[in-house]
Amino acid sequence: MSQTVRKAIIPAAGLGTRFLPATKAQAKEMLPIVDKPTLQYIIEEAIASGIEEILIVTGRNKKSIEDHFDRSVELELELEQKNKKEMLEMVQNISNMVNIHYIRQKEPKGLGHAVHCAKSFIGDEPFAVLLGDDIVDADTPCLKQMINCYDEYKTTVLGVQEVAKENVDKYGILDVKHIEDRVYKVKDMVEKPAVEEAPSNIAILGRYIITPEIFNILENQAPGKGGEIQLTDALQTLATKEAIYAYNFEGRRYDVGDKLGFLEATVDFALKRPELRDEFIEFLKTKSDDVER
C-alpha cells in the first residue's frame, strides 16, 4: 500500500434542496462565492495540499460541474480575439488544474455509498475525502494539515473542530482521548446524536484521510440514520480494527450548504479581494446603519 496521499474523493451527488429553486437545474456545488464556484475552492485546497488525482462523485443535474472543469474552446477563442489575456489565462487554468475523473452515484444512498463508488479509482491507497459543503479558509490548507498528521501516524485521520453544544445533532460526533496539541485518538463516534446523548462537542467537519480498509467495511455496511449508508458507521467499525485519530485543524470553516454560512463566506471572501474591499466595506457600513435605525 502506498503511504502517500495522492488521490481525493469529492462527493457531489446531493440534491441541494436547501437552496431550491436555485438548485433545481444546476448543481449546488456550482453556486458561486463571489465569482468562483464553491467546488473550485475545494479543488484548489486539494491541489495546494499535494493531491494529484480527484474523483468527483456526481448525480443527476451535475453536468455543469464537468463543463466547468473541462475546456471551453469557444470561450477561449472569443477571449483571445478580444485580447482579454488575463481572463483567457484564468479560464485555461481551470481546465488544467489537476486530473479530474467522474463517476455517477445512481441513487442517493448516503455518504458511505458515495465513497464506496470510488473503490476502483482508489485501489489500495490511503485517500482524502473533501465534502462539498465545507470550505476552510486557513493559512496552511486544511487538507495539508491533515496529511501532515497522517504522515506521522500512518492511519485514518478525521478533520474536526468544536461546535456549539446545541448543534451536535447536525454532525458526526467523537468520543476522544487527547494525545498532543491538536491530535486526539478516537474512542468512539456517533452520527448526529441528540444533544443529551453526545459524547462531546468535537465534530467531524468535512475532511477525512482514510485507509483503503474502509471499502471492505462499506461493502457490508447496513443502512443507518435516515436509511442511508453512513460513513460514520463504517468508520466506527474501522476503529475496532485500527487506530483512528482526529486532527483539530486550524482555520475558519464555512458550512456553505447552509444559507447563513454561504452568506458569511461570500462576505468574508469578498473582503479579501483588493478590487472589492474598500467599496464593499462602505456598502456594509451603510447597511449596518440601516439595520440599526
Regions from the PLM with identified roles:
Residues D137-N216, Q221, K225:
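Conserved core of the sugar-phosphate nucleotidyltransferase
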Residues L130-G132:
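Active-site acidic Asp-centered loop
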Residues A25-Q40:
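Short catalytic helix/loop segments, enriched in acidic residues and glycine
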Residues S2-I10, R18, K36-P126, D137:
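Conserved N-terminal catalytic core of the sugar/cofactor nucleotidyltransferase
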Residues Q3-V5, P126, V176, R182-K185, ...:
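Conserved alpha/beta core of the MobA/IspD/sugar-nucleotide pyrophosphorylase nucleotidyltransferase superfamily
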Residues L88-N99, H178-V183, T237-A239:
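Short, conserved catalytic or adaptor-binding loops enriched in Gly and charged residues
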Residues L15, D134:
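Active-site metal-binding loops of divalent metal-dependent hydrolases
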